[in-house]
Amino acid sequence: MIKEAILKVVNGNDLNAKEAYGAMDEIMSGESSEVQMSAYLTALSMKGETIEEITASTKAMRAHCVKLLNDEEVLEIVGTGGDGSNTFNISTTSSIVISAAGVPVAKHGNRSASSKCGAADVLEALGVNIYIEPEKSLKILKEINLCFLFAQNYHLAMKFVAGVRKELSIRTIFNILGPLTNPAGATMQVLGVYDESLVKPLCEVLKNVGVKSALSVYGQDGLDEISVSDKTSVCELRDGRLKCYEIAPEDFGMERCSKEDLVGGNPRENAEITLSILNGQKGPKRNAVVLNSAAALYVAGKADSIEDGVRLASEIIDSGRAKKQLEKFIEYTNS
């Protein structure tokens, strides 16, 4: 299947769903050679991945991952990475705030790929045990509305392509697939993307793979988050329909900051930033967490609008509930 797919893509032709699924299935099964994987991923990247190809590839990758057998609706807040901005861990910090509001959050992430500090790195620096079994993660999710799904524990088939990705050192479809393949089958999602051209297509993919409510976002300053230093392009999925619009920090009573105000550092430094926000420190970094948390609270139906979500997220931080949630998370993962 992958040989035929390579030939088709090299000639600039799009794959149908069956062809794209088959090619990814071969890769995830370890049946493709490194040369075949390199050719396929490079050609696909040069042609440009279609919605149909991304949807089918997502389904194939999901079929090969270890699943968290969860029967409740959960939310994911995640960025594709690759924006080169080296911000602190906005979505990871936000996941603590969101879950403290009573929204079940299955945060899916990995160690750093394109920045100094990934979700796994900062959580580990905060004292969270990231190496726990799926059964225990599910138990913790049910008890405190929060769990962390360390990608390498769930996407075991990625070992077949890891070497190729490292050697290629170019953006491939896998940069997009990670955030689309939550092992808990998240049905609510805030997805940050690294390129404005992906905002609507990836929202369409989320719809195709069963997500019910979502925001796909791109900060126009280049962030794969909702930005507080520029406008943000948004595509919203609600009731099976897509709606695209822009939002700005001023819409929510926030001052624009400079992009540099959101820069983080190594895991220890980013852990300190997260703690300072949860301890109530004001400023641009807190605003970024509040606004991204607000969007997720809106997606989850805990707030009637992003504006209402801003009020709720602020109250959760100021009341100390978010800090207590982190303390519980550390305790539960280490007990």
Swiss-Prot record:
It catalyses: N-(5-phospho-beta-D-ribosyl)anthranilate + diphosphate = 5-phospho-alpha-D-ribose 1-diphosphate + anthranilate. Mg(2+) 2 binds at D224, E225. Pfam families: Glycos_trans_3N, Glycos_transf_3. One of its GO terms (cellular component) is cytosol. Coiled coil: none annotated. GO terms for molecular function: anthranilate phosphoribosyltransferase activity; magnesium ion binding. InterPro entries: Anthranilate_Pribosyl_Tfrase, Glycosyl_Trfase_fam3, Glycosyl_Trfase_fam3_N_dom, Glycosyl_Trfase_fam3_N_dom_sf, Nuc_phospho_transferase. Anthranilate 1 binds at G79, N110. Binds 2 magnesium ions per monomer. Its EC number is 2.4.2.18. Mg(2+) 1 binds at S91, E225. Anthranilate 2 binds at R165. Its cofactor is Mg(2+). It is an enzyme of class 2 (transferase). 5-phospho-alpha-D-ribose 1-diphosphate binds at residues 79, 82-83, 87, 89-92, 107-115, 119. Gene3D superfamilies: Nucleoside phosphorylase/phosphoribosyltransferase catalytic domain (3.40.1030.10), Transferase, Pyrimidine Nucleoside Phosphorylase, Chain C (1.20.970.10). Catalyzes the transfer of the phosphoribosyl group of 5-phosphorylribose-1-pyrophosphate (PRPP) to anthranilate to yield N-(5'-phosphoribosyl)-anthranilate (PRA). This is Anthranilate phosphoribosyltransferase. It comes from Methanobrevibacter smithii (strain ATCC 35061 / DSM 861 / OCM 144 / PS). The gene is trpD.
